[in-house]
């Protein structure tokens, strides 16, 4: 056989043989070695060739087993794998295993490279023949002892195991020898990884399938000792080679396995156990809740957690799931050579149920090789023996090539704590070795809590630490050889297997974070097997393994290139601080290498960043951050591998918390990388601190002892108490994970998806979505990090489809996406040379960023309308990636969805550019900056708990400091990055559309329009500095990067160093290439024309809603009628053809769009107006307002049917759309009617009432004033609205009409001249804008509303706002004051008549007091009027001064009506002289008359003097104005009025002439023959008409004013002589009247009659018929009306519609009529007695010039149906004039 083995050296690897050959080889081996051997410890033991103990059935079998063991140990040539020196432990001095070692094996080499060389076919046959032999190493405590060999029989004695167990307990105090738990767990871990070996190597049919099927996780099994319903005891969870599979999904029932064979006695029992285990696993897979998908460290795949089986009475090295046999298991030791400690626990139980008929399993350890066999009383079938042999071969090969022989001789520490160290271990576990309790539940709960989570995610108090071992002379054996490995070595496959499964065996293994960080510190990284995500066991022998090694070498080169980045990101060593325990004792904590302690080894220099804690305290490693290029992991692999839940959550009552990193990524502003294990560790500690949970820092490397043995230790050691179970996972986290998982499967079809499309995945519920968003934002690493980039895009798209915006979620999700983008070697994939195969390839393909995912991401972010810092950077990164894809041709126009999503991405980016940047979140206080990133988030997701002590929080603060997830790009702001990404994206997109016309054909009409819109917006934003985003880019490009260096140097230190490897070490250095190389987007007209043509050709395919959208897009594109006429023409044709079928909402959108575009196509507008009229009854209030505002206010397009229908629908009681309008809508509605001069009394009244109903809470003062102004422009008066607005504006609410705010004191000259008196009566409310005051004053003047105190408030307001208003507003204020003042200076009052004195004489004495009070009131009124006249004169003078001092063109263009009226008023007041005094006043001497007459004469003289002063001031200011310009303005006004009122004036003048001819007087007749006017004209007293003349268009006051119809009469008033007979009824003579009157007053009456009879009065009268036209009618034509432009110097509401030139508003009416109406005024429509303010001013000016004015209203004249009615009205006018002349 040895010759065969020697010949087999250098042959092909054993595991690469064909499957058929392997089957034949194993069959021959099994036929040769049929009998199995049971090796039992203690009784019969023998040493075989280097310490292997073999229980033989015969010499031949023993020899075969020995040759097989020797072959598997020595002859196989292991492959070369470089091992880092810090992973190689010192050797053991007294172990004989070193004599049989090879040089390659001592260097950490394994079977992954070229292993198996030297194995021949005969060796394979011999190995298979010896597979049924079990070799176990006996427990050794010192030097190697010889052992006896015993022959195993089917019925072996039952006392050996119990004796061995009792000896071990009596010697060590608990169930395991020194190091037994750790070494035993190493065998378990090696057996755990055996299926990977089987999967990597070919196997016979029926064997590899069963071996590759993972066994049931222990959490799916019922607890030991509890009977099942079938009457059988439940199987205890075992840990064996079949327990580790490729994933953690549902597994098939474990095959019936006993290590080397099955006896007839145990065959049925094992089958039942397997069936029971399968049923339990299937049931658990359905009933168990999903585990938390916590992301593992980079390169590490999660594996199922294995629990300790010692408490359940099952041997750890048993591959099957067997029933516990009390008192039968013997403690044993086993060791596995390798750089990683694979620790487990042995089983020890009480002596109950000693009569149980069951087999036992033992194991012995020698030279690191452990082979276990069980032989029962019954025989085994060939299939079972084949499986057992296969398992034995795999186990031995694993232990040989991946394990290290030897064990620890370190003495036990004091206090009963056992720290087991081996020659190959770098960490130990204590939770797996549990005490031998009665039922084992306490130990199980303790171990479950410790090992149910991966190492990087365990609570800080329970994470395993790396103990130190004594150095120097104690390093012997294999460890001494291993210490000579080079420093650049790589981990072995055993380490890869250990790192691939986060927790192997019954306890936590070496912290993977330590491996990764140590590798990073050494400048290396883990094996390529880890990065490939494949099964680590012996995979290197296959092509996949070679590819993985090549990828690892490539990553090593990349790591070397970025070594500077990794070194910069490493934080300095954290200063150690004491950790407060439960008992208050603070142990000593050291940093770096500490003093050698018993049971601990010296740490190498590479692990100097770990904190070493004294005995009883776990060490918390603090690893430096790992750069993104050093940790490249497949995101889909981490996301798709769920983490199983420990059985503590199912079988025990203790809660279990899935403690996960909770570091928030909301503050990440740049590309981030994945969280390292140190970050996860600190985050878990922060979560624990935030939840207020204080855990017992029990030593995880020491096994738990029995109650009896550990009682003294518990009393003496404060840290021996078991740790409290972690809190359960919050329900909101579970719900959030479920919702996000369902949303991650959502595939959006377009950017218009709504909530309905989410129903198949996750039906939209606001509460559920909000809770999930809050949980994900609080714990992004737990809920968002496991998702891949396409899944994150699907989640954002789901929230966008639901319309649910949660800004913290968007920030956290963008941060996670940036981390994945940076951690995968750039967005979109890993290394270029890696070609993964199989499942890894599919996973990588699903995790990579795709074109669809990037477009979906951008579209969803734009739809949600949020642009924070992380979101902006993510959008910029996605834009750069899309531009690269388009540039390289990776995306080609080959599918319809590509065109759809390209258009959506362009639209989304342009939309994001236009969104305002979100306000940055204020940073936390410096004291709690580190804790705020993790602790508050964890506290929100956990139940309320007691706060942690201050000491614990203070000591844990440095441990919470985590490195940044990504290097901060301190170079540029997010806005600048967004602009740069937009430039690249739109440039490449335009080029792609230009080069590949297929993109156009993949877009429909809407998508082409959206793309055109996006390109237009990009040209505006990134074009030659016109836009907002381009300003920062090009200012920086022109001025260099110095500005950015000063403004963007916020991130220093680590962020700058991290950014150096990515394009910028500092702010200035990074800004230089960014700004200088920033391209500028140049608009491509050819591409835009192509897109416009594509959209135009597809307009007929659009529905009405899409047609409305096309209107909006064409508007926002800035297309004018002359730029792309074919687009508007096609749109017009489609709209006119389908106008009748368009719904109200699209109609409103179309009309509003055309209004903004100023489209004045009458046919197009008429079609839309008629369609709106037909749909008016179905329109909502806001749609009605939008349509009327567009037609009326913007386009000035008057459609009679449309406006009338709107008035009916809005104001009729049955419809009453006004009830649903707000103040702004009411204002716009009435403004549309005012703009088109469409008068609807019902609507105007209803609008005013609605505004009053809204009140001050529903409307503002400006809105109420605006409505009042619109009503004034329509000549509609609403008294209630007037009073409310005036009271609110000028503060007149407290002034009662009785008091009128009039001062009772005549006052001094100071009160007469200043505005203080006016301010005392009332002033404008403080804080109101000047435009509002001017608008209200204008409305009051136009509607002739003068409440008490208004003039005083107006004068005070004018003095206050005069310096702040323009010329137009000054003219409006002066016009309002002039109109509201009433009388003018030098105007005669009714009290100046001659008969007033006689009436006072005739008053009785009883009325003397009332007369005195009335006289006092009259004097008060006269004084107030005098005061107002002074203020008015001052205002007019200041107005003329401002008019002459202005530099603008004079006369000003608008509002010209007020300027003309003011100029006419000033001219009239300055040039007209007051009429002469009456004749009787001139004839009487100055000394005669009563006292009243004397006072009246004094007042007349005073008023004449004041009139002279006023005239002098006005003349001086008028002379300063250019005379020619003023004459030209007056001439224009005169001609316009003459042309407008010429026909009507001639008609009135002809009727007046006809009436005067009836009373014609013959000029040749003498005074005796003249006839008086008819008595029915005059009444008493009679008068005689001497002459009359009628003319039209008479100019008065030096041409400043025009009289419409002038009538000049000469009459003689007095008593006729008695001899003269008058026509008609006779009249009584004066004498007869004297004789008839009796009484005391007879003498006075006779004197008066004699005076009038002796002095007849002859008087010349000037009668002015002032024609008052109605407001101009609205234009009845559909011709568009241009909107009026405001004056350059005017602003505010004073330059509104009423202050504009009427000719510019209504071209439908003649210009002359419009100007005449503005100059002369018109009647108020809803008032029969009041003229407008302009008409009142004209009448007062004519009266001041000496004319008797009779207003003639157009409405009254038009109502006269016949000539007789017209003559009767003219007679009434003449009668009124004659009566006024006779008084």
From Swiss-Prot:
Cross-referenced InterPro entries: LCS_TC/CRSF (IPR052886), RAP (IPR013584)
Origin: domain of life: Eukaryota
Protein name: Trans-splicing factor Raa3, chloroplastic
UniProt keyword terms in alphabetical order: Chloroplast, mRNA processing, mRNA splicing, Plastid, Transit peptide
Subunit structure: Part of a 1700 kDa complex that includes the precursor RNA to exon 1 and the tscA RNA.
Predominant subcellular localization, coarse grouping: plastid
Comp. bias regions, Polar residues: 307-316
Function as written in the Swiss-Prot or TrEMBL entry: Required for trans-splicing of exons 1 and 2 of the chloroplast encoded psaA mRNA (a group II intron). May be required for stability of the chloroplast RNA-protein complex in which it is found.
Xref: PROSITE patterns: RAP
Biased amino acid composition, Gly residues: 105-118
Residues covered by the RAP domain: 1713-1772
GO biological process: mRNA processing; RNA splicing
NADP keyword on record: no
Compositionally biased intervals (Basic and acidic residues): 256-273
Record's compositionally biased regions (Basic residues): 1494-1506, 1620-1630
Upper taxonomic lineage: Eukaryota, Viridiplantae, Chlorophyta, core chlorophytes, Chlorophyceae
Location of the region described as Disordered in the Swiss-Prot/TrEMBL record: 97-378, 420-484, 563-610, 652-709, 918-971, 1395-1427, 1476-1506, 1620-1639
The species this protein was found in: Chlamydomonas reinhardtii
Stretch forming the transit peptide: 1-40
Subcellular location: Plastid, Chloroplast stroma
